[in-house]
């Protein structure tokens, strides 16, 4: 019995001093882009399986995630847009994790299969208001988009040159809500992360180009944006957060990132 107890005690001592035991390491908190849910979920799960360190994710949207980093309420912010000058002036740093296409989605019943960027812009600014104007059915186009502060919205409006001019019927707070709404309305059109699109909606080609890893990587699919990790330049990450950051920005994470449907930056 004494021998068993001493072995158990020795094991506890070894565990407390070994890098292989992670019970005392704090969790890593991430906050931000709802479009990055899938890739952060995959990376967080892989990292936790390898290290035992938990990664939490708060899907608040890009703008809120950036604010959370600035306020010191999370370790790593997640943004599906580049940092603005005023955000950089707050001492925030952007590291590109991956590139993601923004899919233009319609209801599966919609006969439209391809739109060019100019036509998409005319639709969202109200210049084209009925599907029949571009070869579809006689139905008013229902414009679905994201809320102000969304990285996906920022990227979409920047690429289509429609900032502050979109005539949204609904401005929704998550990628999932956009997909669900378009799936439920035959006259709707929306935009969402390619990595998040489900079979309940149809992705149209843009200028004849289908969004894919290859077309996003070579730039031929033009409706794309970066997935960005946001940190504070003058604030050191915790040991756990630094370990997670180093892993997800390394070549080791490339396969996991690719499995989430986005293109790794490294």
What residue spans do the PLM features occupy?
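Exported/periplasmic ABC-transporter solute-binding proteins
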Residues: 4, 22-266
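Sec-dependent N-terminal signal peptides of Gram-positive bacterial secreted proteins and lipoproteins
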Residues: 2-23
């Amino acid at each position: 019995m004494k021998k068993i107890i001493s072995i158990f005690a020795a094991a506890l001592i070894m565990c407390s001093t070994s890098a292989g035991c992670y019970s005392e390491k704090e969790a890593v908190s991430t906050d931000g882009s709802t479009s990055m849910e899938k890739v952060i979920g995959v990376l967080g799960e892989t990292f936790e399986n390898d290290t035992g360190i938990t990664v939490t994710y708060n899907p608040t949207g890009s703008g809120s995630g950036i604010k959370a980093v600035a306020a010191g309420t999370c370790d790593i912010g997640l943004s599906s847009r580049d940092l603005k000058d005023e955000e950089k002036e707050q001492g925030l740093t952007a590291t590109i994790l991956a590139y993601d296409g923004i899919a233009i989605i319609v209801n599966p019943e919609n006969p439209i299969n391809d739109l060019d960027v100019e036509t998409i812009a005319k639709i969202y600014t109200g210049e084209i208001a009925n599907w029949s104007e571009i070869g579809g059915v006689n139905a008013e186009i229902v414009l679905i988009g994201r809320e102000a502060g969304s990285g996906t919205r920022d990227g979409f409006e920047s690429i289509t040159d429609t900032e502050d001019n979109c005539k949204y019927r609904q401005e929704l707070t998550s990628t999932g809500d956009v997909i669900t709404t378009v799936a439920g309305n035959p006259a709707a059109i929306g935009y969402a992360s390619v990595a998040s699109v489900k079979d309940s909606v149809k992705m149209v080609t843009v200028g004849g180009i289908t969004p894919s890893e290859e077309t996003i990587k070579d730039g031929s699919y033009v409706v794309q944006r970066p997935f960005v990790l946001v940190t504070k330049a003058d604030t050191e990450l915790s040991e756990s957060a630094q370990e997670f950051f180093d892993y997800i920005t390394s070549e080791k994470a490339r396969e996991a990132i690719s499995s989430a449907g986005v293109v790794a930056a490294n």
